[in-house]
Amino acid sequence: MNSRTGPPHAESRWPVALVIIAVLFLLEALPEQVRLLPKWVVYVIGFAVLIPIGAVGLTAARARWLHVERKVTLLFFLVAGILTVANLVNLIRGILGRSAEMDGLQLLASSTGVWVTNVLMFSMLYWQIDRGGPEARMNGTSARPDWFFPQEGAPAKAVLLAWQPTFIDYLYLGYSTATSLSTTDTVPLTSRAKLLMMLESAIALVTIVVVASRAVNILAS
């Protein structure tokens, strides 16, 4: 694909920053018996991720900060993913052990937090890895796509000129994957995209079927 001429274009980072803050809030708000790490660790992780993201916006996507942002974002996904799975395992252990420490409302709130965190962290990962990252997409230097969006096959009059997916598109991809548990309007093209969507769907399925359903049963009894 031919690159665009002129100064490089940078995608807005405020939606990503809001998502990171939301993930940190959800991880911090979990009950003590579910949370894996102390609160201060969550805050340290948050600042470590938000600093390079803010620097990318302030420096007009300077290459050095883009590199740091990509590494830190992928590390954040890894840490948040491990915490999410660990929190889910703790919830299931509490259910199987019939722990009296959590009532139905706490269990429902915790399962909702795990489900939303799952959606948000996978959305960030999809946004960061597809076609080489956001700036590669914005400037026409993107690599092989991992997903095919419906706008790419739509008539020219139906979409904006030189349309490229932004974070909101990947947020919707993450949400639809977790709700439908399958492919919707956006099609995975690579093996890693399919495996990641399978993993997200599996976490969402366990959260809904095992944890949330048990919470509803407790509240109804």
Regions found by a protein language model. Give the residues of each.
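Membrane-proximal soluble regions of multi-pass membrane proteins
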Residues: 128-186
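N-terminal membrane topogenic signal
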Residues: 4-18
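Pore domain of cation channels
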Residues: 164-221
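Short, hydrophobic transmembrane alpha-helix segments
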Residues: 27-40
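Hydrophobic alpha-helical transmembrane segments of multi-pass integral membrane proteins
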Residues: 17-27, 45-53, 73-91, 113, ...
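Canonical alpha-helical transmembrane segments
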Residues: 50-64
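Non-cytosolic membrane-interface motifs at loop->transmembrane helix junctions
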Residues: 37-42, 68-74, 99-110
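Pore-domain transmembrane helices of cation channels
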Residues: 96-135
